[in-house]
Amino acid sequence: MGKTLYEKVYDAHVAVAAEGETPILYIDRHLVHEVTSPQAFDGLREKGRKVRQVSKTFATMDHNVSTTTKDINASGEMARIQMETLSKNCEEFGVTLYDLNHKYQGIVHVMGPELGITLPGMTIVCGDSHTATHGAFGSLAFGIGTSEVEHVLATQTLKQARAKTMKIEVKGKVAPGITAKDIVLAIIGKTTAAGGTGYVVEFCGEAITDLSMEGRMTVCNMAIELGAKAGLIAPDETTFEYIKGRKFSPQGADFDAAVEYWKTLKTDADAEFDAVVTLNAADIKPQVTWGTNPGQVIAVDQPIPAPESFTDPIEKASAEKALAYMGLEAGKSLSDYQVNKVFVGSCTNSRIEDMRAAAVVAKGRKVASHVQALIVPGSEQVKAQAEAEGLDVIFKEAGFEWRLPGCSMCLAMNNDRLGPHERCASTSNRNFEGRQGRDGRTHLVSPAMAAAAAIAGHFVDIRELTFDKQD
């Protein structure tokens, strides 16, 4: 029987497989940030160990950096300590660090791919839930805890049980204006936020292969939000074109040889998955979450669901609780509610394509007077590219705030956060209670939908907006 893409990558990395024991996998790349690494480095220090392979370990500062200044003190005492500690640890152990003032600084899951650190067929780990992002390249990438961070630093390996496999196929082409974010939110709406638990997911189908690498990263980024361990997309010409010429990518003949291997990284025709989920791309509309997990999502033109519409008693109770927390009334439209803040950014949607999509909506328009709207590029490289294209000017003229790179309002670990009961249209990946600030209300949307909400002051259907034909 043939193998799935996941099985091929997993099997190629088994370093030790003893009977009755969880296999030990070799790890090709280890990405590190300031929040989940301090205790791991302390553990190495206590035991007198070194970082086993510094050339495969890359660090940056992202979670609690300020997006208004490069001052390390700006996000408070804990943030300053974490960033200073990362700096000291990387210097002591010889690890490459892209710190606050480095031209490659950025969100770890934006920085890795754009520098060619992320390559097809690799195993990639990071002390961060959304490491699955890198699976867009056909790599096996997943988040790990701090004790596992220490283990990988010390050994370049990790115990990892084989997961079940799930195929999620999005058949056909999406309608105009439908983005990768809409696709993945529609997927989670179908599977629920726990539907992928215990699985590694492979996303496929015409709607997936039509996506750019930025779009594919958005989809894989949210694999964790349907409960999956990781999400992968088979590499193809789009992947190879993106990788070519990047800082850490193979060059010349080495690149050609790598591509020959990467072309083998696809699921065999006779491979079997443990579960299969299918969606028709043509049915996908612009998506907005209404509740407090990413599976509580509807199309923008659908009414807010009533708890009674759920047959499962747990889902019904969850819906009741979510509506109360979110301050929403069943049967109403999401467009009936004003938004207070808009956030375009995060490891889900802060790449150049996302900036461009938001700028198309912003051009020649103005942010509503009651809305604060933040545009936060995912890295210094994205910021520089956007500014070279004049996108920052478009945003600033429209009344958006053009910020410095960082995780920003995705999570309440820096100064960008919601106040109690503030409603936010956000391009991030989690709408949990308190995720963006205590009692904050988060609605997950695409960059274009977020920008449109900033201008209208409430949610609108992006398909009903008209754009300058010159764009």
UniProtKB/Swiss-Prot annotation:
The protein's matches in InterPro entries, at most eight in alphabetical order, are given as: 3-IsopropMal_deHydase_lsu (IPR004430), Acnase/IPM_dHydase_lsu_aba_1/3 (IPR015931), Acoase/IPM_deHydtase_lsu_aba (IPR001030), Aconitase_4Fe-4S_BS (IPR018136), Aconitase_4Fe-4S_dom (IPR036008), IPM_dehydratase_rel_enz (IPR050067), IPMI_cat (IPR033941)
Q: In which pathway does it act?
A: Amino-acid biosynthesis; L-leucine biosynthesis; L-leucine from 3-methyl-2-oxobutanoate: step 2/4
Task: Give the signal peptide range.
Answer: none
What cofactor(s) does the depicted protein rely on? [4Fe-4S] cluster
- Give the CDD domains listed for this entry: IPMI
The chemistry this enzyme catalyses reads: (2R,3S)-3-isopropylmalate = (2S)-2-isopropylmalate
Q: What would you give as a GO molecular function for this chain, any one?
A: metal ion binding
**What quaternary structure, including any partners, is listed in this protein's UniProt entry?**
Heterodimer of LeuC and LeuD.
Query: What is the role of the protein in this entry?
Result: Catalyzes the isomerization between 2-isopropylmalate and 3-isopropylmalate, via the formation of 2-isopropylmaleate.
Q: What is this protein called?
A: 3-isopropylmalate dehydratase large subunit
Q: Which organism is it from?
A: Vibrio parahaemolyticus serotype O3:K6 (strain RIMD 2210633)
Q: What is the lineage of its organism?
A: Bacteria, Pseudomonadati, Pseudomonadota, Gammaproteobacteria, Vibrionales
